[in-house]
Amino acid sequence: MGKFKSHIFLCFFGTGVLTNLNQPIFKIVEDLSYTNSGNHRHKLDLFLPEGRTKKNDLPLVVWIHGGAWQSGNKKSGRNSHRLPRVLKTGRYVGASIHYRLSDEVKWPAQIYDCKAAIRWLRGNAEKYGIDPLKIAVWGSSAGGHLASMLGVSSLNKELEGSLGSFSNISSTVQAVINYYGPSAFLKMDDFPSKIEHHSA
């Protein structure tokens, strides 16, 4: 796990191969459903490197959007330069996931959705050239919180849920990147913000 995480961080902050971000060298497969619910929020986008010369499976980096659990969508994985910067290296497969928001369902539905997405991605790893033992989750704000929850709850059956057709597959992740996601919920609204998190 340590080696994989270090490798990811080096790619995030390297600059040698991260130019021309407007000309992606990856194929985007949109709106893949990771459950059989029919809910438009139960979808993800997949980013597959073009021109792969090696047949070995690649690590997967999963982006989880922020928005105080009240807003946001999977398009942020493409619109922000964060995930594309990593994928431009050609060393990773990427995914950006939707999850249900707090105006539709209450916690822990959001982590159920994220875990269902991880199970689906791992269940389809061979199809998309993903190494099922090297899955990292990366999120900002509320997405950072959900990434952290994925990292610490792999043995917690109460947070697993039963969504999707891969309930027998592990939702464990090997690396977590929490980008300013909250951990002290009783304190986070003590600081100025455009969003009232307590309303989520």
Model-inferred region functions:
Residues 57, 72-75, 107, 149-150, ...:
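Short, solvent-exposed loop/turn and secondary-structure capping segments
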Residues 68-71, 75, 94, 120:
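Serine-hydrolase catalytic-loop signature spanning alpha/beta hydrolases and amidase-signature enzymes
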Residues 60, 88-98, 136:
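A fold-wide structural signal in alpha/beta-hydrolase
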Residues 116-192:
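Primarily recognizes the serine-hydrolase "nucleophile elbow" in alpha/beta-hydrolase
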Residues 50, 67, 93, 98-102, ...:
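Short beta-to-alpha linker loops that shape the active-site pocket of alpha/beta-hydrolase fold enzymes
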Residues 56-68:
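Short beta-strand element of the alpha/beta-hydrolase
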Residues 17-56:
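N-terminal cap/lid segment of alpha/beta-hydrolase-fold proteins
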Residues 75-95:
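Short amphipathic alpha-helix adjacent to the substrate-entry channel of hydrolases
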